[in-house]
């Protein structure tokens, strides 16, 4: 197993489009790269829902006397999430050590195979998940998702500082769900952290209608190329 690049997609607040943009990054690159998504949001996993894999349980395989989960596959994207492992109507009410253990299981007990890019859909906020991910994975860089809301901006600044303290590189941030009534955020809003792109409000994103035309219009493949080669 080899993973060439590991990219964390993060947000300080829930509901800003982080998981959707993670999926759209993966879909925009899946034609030319071997892509995986690690859904690190143990308490609120969404990737299996975004890819319509709600009712599918991961297959277990034995390799060298060890059990591994086969990642679910959709659109040539490998997806590992606690969502299909737990029943959808059951919440994971776990303390920090159990959360860290679940993340380690997803990382090390998933039969990823060879990947060009692994996107990590981070949980909102900061805390144990960030510490575990930073220790267990060699993250090449992170991308933050924020809206123009002052609350989102304030919390994003805190999460950026958390990544800096954990020595997680930061590629930049994406401003999501802008409309003609909102001013576009200043490129220097977070100091030396650049703005990678702005995404206008699009109903298709909220209804999870990830059509080829939507994927093409967002040009997230070009965004990836720009920040990965900077």
Question: How would you name each of these model-derived features?
Answer:
Residues 18-23, 45-46, 122-130, 153-155:
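Short glycine/serine/threonine-rich phosphate/pyrophosphate-binding segments
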Residues 5-39, 173:
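Walker A/P-loop phosphate-binding motif and the immediately C-terminal alpha-helix
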Residues 160-230:
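C-terminal lobe/tail of nucleotide-utilizing enzymes
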Residues 81-82, 143-147, 173-176:
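Conserved beta-strand segments of the P-loop GTPase G domain that flank and frequently precede/overlap
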Residues 113-126, 138-159:
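Conserved Switch II/interswitch segment of TRAFAC-class P-loop GTPases
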Residues 33-36, 40-85:
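Phosphate-binding loop that captures ATP/GTP phosphates
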Residues 83-133:
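Phosphate-binding/switch loop-helix module in NTP-utilizing enzymes
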Residues 3, 14, 47, 80, ...:
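Residue-level signature of catalytic and energy-coupling elements of molecular machines
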